[in-house]
Regions:
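Glycine-rich phosphate/diphosphate-binding loops and the adjacent beta-loop-alpha structural elements
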Residues: 16-24, 50-59
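A short, acidic, amphipathic alpha-helical segment used as a generic capping/interface helix at domain edges
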Residues: 28-42, 65
Length: 117
């Protein structure tokens, strides 16, 4: 969030955003940060989200995260995969920045495929 409103904030057009938070972040912090991101001018270009698994100390539950996502009408038609092992958790997957990917998010059939990096 520190780059929002600056010349260093990236263009979000045609992007899949990878979001994660640290152990001190609580559900209200994530909710506020997500809403702030939604208000960015290029947010309409976002094509999907991959949300990292929250650390246990954050007390974020699957139900809380689902409620936060459901409360954002701007997310209703976007594919979203949550509880992915990257960021501040272990095990940790490393994803390339940039490149091309395909994201499909269905209840029991989700896929993130890195096509080019």
């Amino acid at each position: 969030n520190l780059l929002q409103g600056t010349e260093y904030f990236p263009d979000l057009n045609d992007s899949i955003l990878f979001l994660e938070d640290d152990e001190v972040s609580k559900s209200v912090d994530f909710d506020r940060d997500l809403q702030s991101l939604i208000h960015q001018p290029s947010f309409t270009g976002v094509r999907g989200f991959v949300i990292g698994r929250f650390q246990k100390t954050s007390n974020m539950t699957d139900e809380m995260l689902a409620n936060i996502i459901a409360s954002k009408k701007e997310l209703s038609n976007l594919p979203i995969i949550a509880n992915v092992d990257f960021g501040h958790t272990s095990p940790m997957i490393t994803f390339p920045i940039g490149g091309t990917a395909h994201l499909r998010a269905k209840k029991d059939n989700s896929l993130l495929k890195i096509l080019k990096h």
